[in-house]
């Protein structure tokens, strides 16, 4: 699960490597690239109550540099990018991989994975609000008269960002990498130009200052860590977007551009404050001369929009994974590109994110206030990923327990300290990401649990398919009439006679010439090769069982898959084929195994789920739905 996961990388030309690395700069590093706008400013606040000292400034920059080194470089760039699921990364991808080898603690792993996904979705709300606000706030330095318009301008920018999602971003996405690369170069140049303000800032490379500061400051040191962590927000994107770019391009972009640019910019901000303590109110923008402020604000706004776009796209992708893995109900998914199936738009998710983002902007009003709420979701997601990575190296790489503990325990402890520091901000807005993540976790856990209970209940009343076929194939005077054509019955249980088939016989008293029992199954791999897509079993002269396999990153286009299946010899004409779907009317039961409120939530989610004929892209004029009541 390392080099072999991206075999094409071995033969990647320098030109392709360059363009993939450039593309990753915009998508993968957009979020972490906006952190200099506010991270150092926020870290200064807890220690600036009685004036900031030289030791404190150098120590804060030291903490930031070493946070980037340990958490981003060592954990993500060098380690986690190798822990992939057939080339794909991300929390749910890692969960899908671990579910194959989980021994006795599946529920714990699943809950951890769902928490990580929920925290990421919370991050997808906070990132656009914080990033755009922090960029637009630079207008205050251009002219103070614009101070009252920062929130309205931010709302307009964010509204436009969410409105254009339905049209896709393929046409402009090719500019994301170059624009963000320019952003990093501008930040690096600003940092270099100010390091000469006080070369003493270079002492920040010595970890002594970071450690001594924490030991000296005590409680204030812990508080500061919450702000220092803003330096590494966005690191999860490195892992989540692994499948889009591959390991080597992401690593090259980090070491050759992103890491040096971030380090130089933070050093420049530190030297600026050492040379002029009055600049600590906004050290990022005050690095630039007056004439450059407006262009930098415009560039910063573009960079934050790109970062926000990357997070929103990541949320869409994660939701699709969640649906395919059975953690979320079916939702309408629109494809915004004819050639790239990864470019999707999920209207319901877009609406939820938009409402949440606007609420955050209007509620917090400034990036200062919102930054206090930001760290919890990110640190929480990182802790979850580290714990799951521990399980990964034990199960997949066969590391011994002592080796795994020695390698990963320090990272987990460090991230737990960061999480504890961020939890101190609960009363200042830190409760917001906790509430968002809790809500998403409850929804996903309820859907998974409710679906399992429903399948277990229906299995007790279902008729085994083999018995049904054996009975129906016996010729008698009571045999149903046979009609020409093909009937395809969708079912989640290939071993039982589908409810739609039984209802069709009960009400219409007919059986088609050819009857296909179709099951759609998502496997714990991102993609399925076309030659492994289907499994066909002929049960009798008139009945066959077909299983279509999809990866959790794939669109479940059943019509297209069946068209391919015809080439193997399964004869049917799509225009003389009817698709029979069962539609269940769920009724809550006091003995369901879930609390009553959870029953109600599950039923509400089921009722809101997208129509299966739309989700599976079945021809609308060939679909027949037959309903039934089911007590859950």
Curated annotation (Swiss-Prot):
Q: Give the disulfide map.
A: none
InterPro entries per UniProt: K+_transporter, K_trans_C, K_trans_N, Kup
What is any Pfam family matched here?
Answer: K_trans_C
**Where would you find the membrane-spanning parts of this chain?**
17-37, 60-80, 106-126, 146-166, 175-195, 210-230, 254-274, 292-312, 344-364, 370-390, 401-421, 426-446
Main localisation:
membrane
Q: Which GO terms describe its cellular component?
A: plasma membrane
Q: What does this protein do?
A: Transport of potassium into the cell. Likely operates as a K(+):H(+) symporter.
- Its recorded name reads Probable potassium transport system protein Kup 1
């Amino acid at each position: 699960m390392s080099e072999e996961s991206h075999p094409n990388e071995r033969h990647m030309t320098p030109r392709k490597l360059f363009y993939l690395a450039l593309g990753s700069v915009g998508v993968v590093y957009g979020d972490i690239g906006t952190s200099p706008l506010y991270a150092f400013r926020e870290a200064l606040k807890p220690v600036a109550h009685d004036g900031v000292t030289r030791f404190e400034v150098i120590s804060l920059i030291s903490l930031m540099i070493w946070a980037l080194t340990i958490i981003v470089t060592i954990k993500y760039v060098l380690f986690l990018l190798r822990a992939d699921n057939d080339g794909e990364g991300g929390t749910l991808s890692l969960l899908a991989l671990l579910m194959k080898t989980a021994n006795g603690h599946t529920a714990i792993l699943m809950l951890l994975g769902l928490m990580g996904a929920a925290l990421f979705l919370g991050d997808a709300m906070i990132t656009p609000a914080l990033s755009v606000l922090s960029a637009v706030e630079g207008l205050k330095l251009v002219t103070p008269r614009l101070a009252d318009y920062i929130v309205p301008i931010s709302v307009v920018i964010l509204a436009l960002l969410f409105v254009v999602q339905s049209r896709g971003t393929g046409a402009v996405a090719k500019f994301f990498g170059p624009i963000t690369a320019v952003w990093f170069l501008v930040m690096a140049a600003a940092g270099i130009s100010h390091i000469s303000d006080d070369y003493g800032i270079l002492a920040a490379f010595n970890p002594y200052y970071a450690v001594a500061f924490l030991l000296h400051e005590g409680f204030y040191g812990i508080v500061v860590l919450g702000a220092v962590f803003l330096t590494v927000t966005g690191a999860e994107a490195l892992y989540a977007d692994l499948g889009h770019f591959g390991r080597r391009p992401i690593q090259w972009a980090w070491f050759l551009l992103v890491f040096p640019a971030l380090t130089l910019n933070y050093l420049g901000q530190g030297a600026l404050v050492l040379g002029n303590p009055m600049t600590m109110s906004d050290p990022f923008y005050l690095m630039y001369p007056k004439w450059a402020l407006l262009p930098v604000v415009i560039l910063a706004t573009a960079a934050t929009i790109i970062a926000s776009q990357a997070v929103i796209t990541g949320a869409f992708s994660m939701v699709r994974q969640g649906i395919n893995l059975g953690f979320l109900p079916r939702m309408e998914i629109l494809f915004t590109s004819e050639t790239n199936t990864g470019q999707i738009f999920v209207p319901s998710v877009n609406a939820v994110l938009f409402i949440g983002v606007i609420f955050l902007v209007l509620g917090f009003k400034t990036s200062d206030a919102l930054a206090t709420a930001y760290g919890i979701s990110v640190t929480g997601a990182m802790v979850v990923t580290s714990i799951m990575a521990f399980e990964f190296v034990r199960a997949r790489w066969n590391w011994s327990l002592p080796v795994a503990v020695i390698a990963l325990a320090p990272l987990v402890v460090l991230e737990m300290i960061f999480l504890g520091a961020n939890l101190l901000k609960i009363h200042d807005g830190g409760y917001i990401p906790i509430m968002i993540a809790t809500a998403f976790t409850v929804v996903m856990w309820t859907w998974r649990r409710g679906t399992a209970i429903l399948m277990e209940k229906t299995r007790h009343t279902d008729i085994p398919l083999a018995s049904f076929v054996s009975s129906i194939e016996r010729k008698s005077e009571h045999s149903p009439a046979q009609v020409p054509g093909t009937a395809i019955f969708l079912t989640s249980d290939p071993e039982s006679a589908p409810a739609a088939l039984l209802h069709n016989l009960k009400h219409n008293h007919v059986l088609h010439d050819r009857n296909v029992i179709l099951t759609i199954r998502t496997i714990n791999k991102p993609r399925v090769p076309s030659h492994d897509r289907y499994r066909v079993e002929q049960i009798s002269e008139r009945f066959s069982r077909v299983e279509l396999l999809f990866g959790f990153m794939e669109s479940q286009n059943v019509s297209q898959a069946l068209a391919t299946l015809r080439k193997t010899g399964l004869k049917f004409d799509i225009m003389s084929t009817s698709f029979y779907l069962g539609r269940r009317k769920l009724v809550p039961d006091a003995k369901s195994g879930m609390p009553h409120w959870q029953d109600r939530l599950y039923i509400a989610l089921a009722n809101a789920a997208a129509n299966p004929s739309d989700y599976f892209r079945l021809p609308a004029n060939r679909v027949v739905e037959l309903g039934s009541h089911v007590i859950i």
